[in-house]
Amino acid sequence: KKRVCIAGLLAMGHEILLLDEPTAGLDPMGEYKMMNLLTRLNKENGVTIVMATHSVDLVPLFLDRLYILSKGQIVRGGTPEDVFTAPEDMSNVKLRLPQIAELIYKLKHEDKMPFERIPLTIGEARREIVKLYA
């Protein structure tokens, strides 16, 4: 249903889509497909996408820039790497890091594992772990 609504908006010639929780209520595969569709619309058709989402695990895979808002104010903004490397800003507004970033952050700070950076995706985490043990 959500894809049909988006198609209708695009058929009317909209160049900007404002979406509130476009992945809400979808299973993980549906969330991934929706975010992939929105990314393709942006990259291939030049459609500007502005969305509100709490799906932080998908953000690093699909978004170039994001802003964390609280009470109408921007708390932090930038690339996913810029935003998610400040977990204190996330917890202050009751958001969490992407799951893999949360795990690596805990390993780095609580278990003193020498990660150079906090990876945001499973692929990035794999590369960082291989670097540590290569």
Language model feature labels by segment:
Residues 59-61:
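A short, surface-exposed alpha-helical micro-motif characterized by mixed small hydrophobic
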Residues 17-20:
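Catalytic Walker B motif of ABC-type/P-loop ATPase nucleotide-binding domains
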Residues 11-15:
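A short, proline-enriched helix->beta-strand linker immediately N-terminal to the Walker B motif
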Residues 28-30:
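Helix N-cap at the start of a conserved alpha-helix in ABC-type nucleotide-binding domains
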Residues 53-54:
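H-loop/switch region of ABC-family ATPase nucleotide-binding domains
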